Swiss-Prot record:
Residues linked to a glycan: 145
Ranges where the record places region Disordered: 112-131
Keyword Phosphoprotein: yes
Source organism of the structure: Rattus norvegicus
Gene responsible for this protein: Eqtn
Subcellular location: Cytoplasmic vesicle, Secretory vesicle, Acrosome membrane; Cytoplasmic vesicle, Secretory vesicle, Acrosome inner membrane; Cytoplasmic vesicle, Secretory vesicle, Acrosome outer membrane
Disulfide bonds: none
Residue numbers on the Vesicular membrane side: 20-183
TM region positions: 184-204
Keywords: Cytoplasmic vesicle, Glycoprotein, Membrane, Phosphoprotein, Signal, Transmembrane, Transmembrane helix
Protein name: Equatorin
Function: Acrosomal membrane-anchored protein involved in the process of fertilization and in acrosome biogenesis.
Main location as per UniProt: membrane
Amino acid sequence: MDFILLIFLSGVFLPNIFSLQPTVEQDPGVTISDDQYYDEEENNTDENSAIFQKLEDNGGDTPANEKTGNYYKDIKQYVFTTPDSKGTKTEVSVTATTDLKFTMKDYKSSKATASGEEDKRSEPSRKSSTPNVPAFWTMLAKAINETAVSMDDKDLFYQAIPASDLNSTNEDQLSELEEIKLKLMLGISLMTLILLIPLLIFCFATLYKLRHLRDKTCESQYSVNPELATLSYFHPSEGSNQTVLTEESSFLPPEESGKVVIIESNTVNEAEVTEERISE
């Protein structure tokens, strides 16, 4: 990269550098004295002084002569400035020694620097307007007066968070979610009603049946038939009971099968007596 830069700069600035050197057209038969040579060199340097700026000799950077150990005394340093389309200028400094050193500097034009100086001067005037008042009260006063407040980096923590960072969902999406929730609640309530109504009906039916069975048991325990009561009542004045057998018996002979057989007994059950009376 240094070699390419050197070639580029040499192609741009070498014509001007060569103009510094004395150009003498010598005829083959003409000889120039030393005085004329130095006079022409001084004239050339005076003509190019408007383009190039001379700087002080830099003795520390000058190389030494290895044979004699002395430094070169005739050392000159030239600075080249070239403007760019962006409004900046590049500086190239050349030292006229055996070692050529190129240094480039970029800096803005004088207009830009002047505007920068004005901005720097205006900033401390704003800060020094209220040096003794706390920052909170100045901010409060500016907020009341509806003036713009210059916030520092530390004050950015107290600013409100924008709504886009908090929630990225739209109102339409929120309304759709609410509708889904309502539908779920209605579905759950309908399912509970469908399950509870048959359960309640079954409970009422079982209770009614149990009550009806209890009433039947009470009636069967205390019911009295008056006919059976009169028939089952024992009368001692009648004497011994007689049972009449009217049924035909296979054990009797056929001659006596149609007769009535009377069986006398002192002890007869009440059930047999009732049956005989009913048959009469």
